[in-house]
Amino acid sequence: MPAVTADTLTLPRIIDPRALGASERSVKSITMAPQGHEGEGFPVRRAFWGVPTADLDPFIHMDQMGEVDYAPYEPRGTDWHPHRGFETVTYIIDGTFLHQDSHGGGGTIANGATQWMTAGSGILHIETPPEALVVKGGLFHGLQLWVNLPARSKMIEPRYQNLEPNLVSLLATADAGSLVRLIAGEIDGHSGPGGTQTPITVAHATVQPGERMTLPWNPAYNALGYVLAGDGTAGPDAHPVSTGNLVVFNSGDSFTFTAGTSALELYLLGGQPIREPVAQYGPFVMNTREELQQAFDDFQAGRLGTVPADGLRPFRG
């Protein structure tokens, strides 16, 4: 169960767009995220696998980490690594992660918090489970999303936002059947706390068993829904969906999900497409091959930062 919950009867309501005659988005595609490993071997689902980049724009990459109940000494993280040219959005649904970067940032991401890092011109950072989770094991569930930056912003100064759970906008659908945790962007005039370089909306929704959730959505944005857990249907034609499915919607003013016999947990994404060339390799997302090569050269020369002398390291026991 997500760490952040609320009584939907007490929350601000999102208007049902059907009452306003909104055009509902049909389903364009449904894909299944394959399982793999990241960093030093922690399990992930590659949420965007097999989806055309034009359907994802301005999003680049997304991994679901867990949900997993780790045995002792099973948790793994990632050691220090560079990024340039995009933003990483790390959302910890349950559990705890430690992080640190070469610009003096660092801290703990836990139980509903989001770490929003704008890599911009370049940064080194590390994300790893704390010693207590490694030694004792325990529940861990999270997501990491990569958001592209337009060419004019790729070399901006790196920055970091720590979005604690109490900052997230908690909303309910008109019938109170769904909880929406608005992390960034806007839904029906309500705003999330995340400051974005690219116009986007990011939210985590819980649709209660048997309930239908229809959300208004910016018609200038694409619309993606990733199933974190549960099963149900998507769109006006009730396409079946389950854990690991990514739903891409066509154009329109709203979209719909309906939960099955258990709660349907959804990570909802949409943004204004950048529509610029993308040159990506490993931790760098630029516009040209020459810019990619420059990023590698700058990293090798230490121009993306250095690991602090007392820098965080993965705990291996």
What would you call each of these model-derived segments?
Residues 1-317:
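Jelly-roll (double-stranded beta-helix
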